[in-house]
Design a protein with these regions (language model features):
Chain A
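Conserved ABC ATPase signature
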Residues: 138-143, 147
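Hydrophobic anchor residue at the start of the ABC signature
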Residues: 153
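Catalytic Walker B motif of ABC-type/P-loop ATPase nucleotide-binding domains
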Residues: 164-167
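Conserved catalytic motifs of ABC-family nucleotide-binding domains
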Residues: 160
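Short coil-to-helix segment of the ABC ATPase nucleotide-binding domain corresponding to the Q-loop/switch region
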Residues: 98-107
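Conserved ABC ATPase "signature" region
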Residues: 67-68, 116-134
């Protein structure tokens, strides 16, 4: 469970302080599929970094499963990320000189999982996301954008995290491949009961979630159930 | 993070930029290689100097004339060993009084022009006694050495060193029975010494031995001696003998203050120690000059690692985002730096070894590659990796994951 209480994030560049997040408060329960939507520069990524324990708020409290993240050290935050959170980034952020399998199993490397088990789990995850086996040993920079994002999703899932954070996961993809990615999230939510936080500036993408939190200029303008939810037919 | 993963990551990272890694390694190769080569040259020199000191005999105390300091001596000195303060009687007294001495061999040495069969050469003529061969470790190859009988009888006989033989009679010839002329006196050659190897400051093979009595009478015309070599029973009695001889000669020369002695008594151990101090200093000097290139190599490592950290900022951010701790990141970059220096160190040792062998092969300078030197080189190269890799690794580990992720 995620709880943000009066979160403020201020960036200081030179003499000028910019308040990127102004008094953000909300709760996300387990097994929710939430989209955080807002225009460019509204502070979505900043918020995701706080939710993802990559950053701490300037003031306010962020609780992940009841634990105050601002009280944790950098290494403890790394532990939390490794155990509880899977990230999917807009820019994929795969290791270019590593194979698909290596990329997917990378989080397990830092969890000190033995090589055999690691590969087994990475293969399982790739199989589950129907990633074509012929590409498992390709270097990640030899893949198409859509495939890269699927590798990134598999990497986010390999640790079996309860919370998946995706920052503009479809931003670099065409509509069709974007749809496949969104379908994957819906499936993960419906069938595996994971909590998914999807960050986007596109209403169309946000409409795949159950609930939409709308932010603008660092403030929540609306937060509520998505009434016209788009469901993608998941029978592949 | 498991060790095998560390190797995997290191290999992947270093092989991704082979040229850069190779050049950085080259810097370390040159550094370690020259350190190994320089130390081996220094130690080789030390070894050959020790050997040449040992080749003049073992457990030796040498008495040489000195110059008298003090009243009336004036500021000009004729140089050590050139004074005529030691007499034959001093040698006889040492022989008689110093009971711990195994053997005493006085000698008078001077350079003369030698002629034989129309050829001539200028060489060292040493007038000495029979025990010289034992005391100074001179082995006879052909014929015999000077005998006590020769000394008593003032025989005009000579024993040649191999180089002198080569100069006068040609290489490989047997000179025994031939006649040589020294200072207008004819000597009959009765022996040839074995080669000691012409290393060191004086060539111990370019030499002629004659009976000391003959030399004093017919060549020098006086009864002075230039060196008295005394052999002790063992290394332990060297210091005692040295002291006893000093006391004896001070008394004989009527000198009360040991500071004003007109002779000097050298102990072979002291000579060895002085020589090794000199060669150690030389080795250190050579190694430190080579060490400078090692430091330059280390800076190369640091430079490359800093560039790598900057280039891979996004990757570091990602690794942190998926759960890498500071330690994981710093270890990864440290491992890369140490691997570079390790490989460089390994190749450097082989290259340094090879080049010191080449130095020996082409110049004849003795070299000695010792295990401690190699171990040191290895340790130093690993330490260079840690020292110069530490800062870049720390910088990588300290990167803020978000800053690193948004880095373009
Ligand atoms: N490290 C930083 N230092 C200074 N300002 C920053 C920093 N990170 C973000 N900002 C500013 O905070 C604001 C919000 O940035 P953020 O990346 O959260 O926006 P966003 O909603 O994700 O936008 P986009 O849709 O373009 O990704 C921007 O104006 C940005 O310039
Ligand atoms: Mg953003």
């Amino acid at each position: 469970m995620i709880e943000c209480k009066n979160i403020v994030k201020t960036y200081r560049s030179g003499e000028i302080d910019t308040q990127v997040l102004k008094n953000i408060s909300f709760k996300i329960n387990d097994n929710e599929f939430v989209a955080i939507m807002g225009p460019s520069g509204s502070g979505k990524s900043t918020l995701m970094h706080i939710i993802g324990c990559l950053d701490t708020p300037t003031s306010g409290e962020y609780l992940l499963d009841g634990q105050d993240a601002s009280k944790l050290s950098a290494d403890e935050l790394a532990d939390v990320r490794r155990q509880k959170i899977g990230f999917v980034f807009q820019a994929f952020n795969l290791l270019p000189r590593a194979t698909v399998l290596r990329n997917v199993s990378l989080p397990l490397v830092y969890a000190a999982v033995a090589k055999e088990e690691r590969e087994e789990r990475a293969k399982e995850t790739l199989r589950a996301s129907a990633f074509p086996e012929g590409f498992w040993h390709h270097y990640s920079n030899q893949l198409s954008g859509g495939m890269m994002q699927r590798v990134a999703i598999a990497r986010a899932l390999v640790n079996n995290p309860a919370l998946i954070l995706a920052d503009e996961p479809t931003g670099n993809l065409d509509t069709k491949t974007g749809a496949v990615v969104l379908a994957t999230f819906q499936l993960l939510h419906q069938e595996q009961g994971r909590t998914i936080v999807l960050i986007t500036h596109e209403p169309y993408v946000a409409e795949h979630a159950e609930r939409i939190i709308h932010i603008r200029d660092g403030e929540i303008v609306s937060d509520g159930v998505n009434r016209n939810r788009r469901l993608i037919n998941n029978d592949h | 993070m498991i060790l095998s993963d560390l190797f995997h990551e290191t290999y992947a990272a270093l092989s991704a930029n082979k040229v850069r890694s190779g050049l950085t390694i080259l810097g370390i190769v040159i550094g370690i290689g020259s350190v190994v080569a320089m130390i081996s040259i220094g130690q080789g020199a030390a070894g050959s100097i020790q050997a040449s000191i040992q080749s003049i005999g073992s457990n030796l105390v040498m008495v040489q004339p000195g110059f008298q300091r003090g009243a009336g001596a004036g500021p000009v000195s004729a140089g050590r060993g050139s004074a005529t303060t030691l007499k034959q009687e001093d040698a006889d007294a040492i022989q008689k009084e110093i009971t711990q001495a195994l053997a005493v061999a006085p000698e008078i040495s001077r350079r003369y022009q030698i002629t034989a069969k129309g050829k001539n050469t200028n060489t060292q003529v040493i007038g000495t006694v029979a025990s010289y061969s034992q005391v100074r470790n001179v082995q006879v190859d052909l014929g015999s050495f000077i005998s006590e009988q020769n000394v008593r009888a003032l025989s005009k006989v000579a024993v040649l060193g191999p180089t002198t033989r080569d100069d006068l009679f040609g290489e490989g010839t047997n000179p025994v029975g031939e006649t040589i002329r020294v200072n207008r006196v004819d000597f009959k050659v009765i022996g040839l010494t074995q080669s000691k190897g012409g290393t060191g400051f004086t060539n111990q093979d370019d030499i002629i031995f004659v009976p000391i009595s003959t030399a004093q009478r017919f060549l020098a015309g006086d009864a002075y001696v230039t060196t008295i070599s005394v052999q002790a029973k063992d290394a332990g009695s060297l210091a005692t003998i040295q002291q006893e001889i000093t006391d004896l000669l001070l008394q004989r020369h009527n000198i009360a203050d040991a500071q004003l002695a007109d002779f000097q008594v050298l102990n072979q151990q002291d000579i060895v120690q002085t020589a090794s101090a000199v060669t150690n200093t030389m080795t250190m000097l050579l190694a430190s000059i080579a060490g400078i290139s090692l430091i330059v190599g280390g800076i190369g490592i640091m430079n490359m690692m800093l560039t790598t950290v900057t280039e891979r900022t996004r990757e570091i951010g990602l690794r942190k985002a998926i759960g890498a701790k500071r330690k994981d990141i710093s270890l990864q970059f440290l491992a890369e730096a140490v691997t570079l220096t390790f490989i460089g160190g390994l190749i450097g040792i082989i290259l340094g070894w090879a080049s010191s062998l080449a130095v020996t092969a082409f110049t004849g300078i003795a070299t000695k590659v010792s295990l401690p030197a190699i171990a040191l080189a290895f340790g130093v190269s690993a330490a260079i990796g840690i020292v110069f890799g530490y800062y870049p690794a720390r910088r990588a580990a300290a990167l803020n994951p978000i800053e690193a992720l948004r880095y373009e």
